[in-house]
Each structure stands twice: as structure tokens, then as C-alpha cells.
């Protein structure tokens, strides 16, 4: 076993089962690619990304941990977000929340 490795049963595994999700359309209005990681508070993502930020407050991408989604310049894509869990407090990132949601 490798430190940090997770051994799972064979078959498919549903991530974030039963958690509230939100689907948003995101457009990269900038001239450079933007990549957003799996656990980044999507509300605070790069300002070049155009989407309903108010709706995305308290959500992150609904993708596997350690992965990311890349938005190319001029690209529009639909992504699914999942509600943040735990204490529902956000610190850091762009400093737009700095406390409970």
C-alpha cells in the first residue's frame, strides 16, 4: 500500500451521493486558459469566468478529488457543482467569504 492510497471494491462508485448539486453554464471571457481544481470554492473562481456567481456560493466542482476542469479562452461549457460539506465555512481563495456561508 502507498501512503494515502485508498483501496476500493471493484465496480462503479458514486461520488457525493445524496449531496445537493447545481448545474451552471460557464464562459471563459478571458484570453488565457483558466483551470479550476476539484475543491476550489467555485464562487471565487477566476473573474474571467462568467457564470451565476451568486448561485455558486458554497459550491465546488462535482469531480473527483485532485482533478480539475480547464476552460479555454472563448469556451463555454456546462459543469455540475456540488454543495460544500463539513462546517460550511470558507477561508482563503480570493478572500471573498472568509467565514461561514
Curated annotation (Swiss-Prot):
Its keywords, alphabetically, are: Cytoplasm, Hydrolase
Q: GO MF annotations for this entry?
A: urease activity
One GO cellular component assignment for this chain's record is:
urease complex
Question: What family is it from?
Answer: Belongs to the urease beta subunit family.
Q: What is this protein called?
A: Urease subunit beta
Q: Where this protein primarily resides, as one coarse class?
A: cytoplasm
Q: Which NCBIfam families match?
A: PRK13203.1, urease_beta
Question: What HAMAP family would the database entry show?
Answer: Urease_beta (MF_01954)
On assembly, the entry states: Heterotrimer of UreA (gamma), UreB (beta) and UreC (alpha) subunits. Three heterotrimers associate to form the active enzyme.
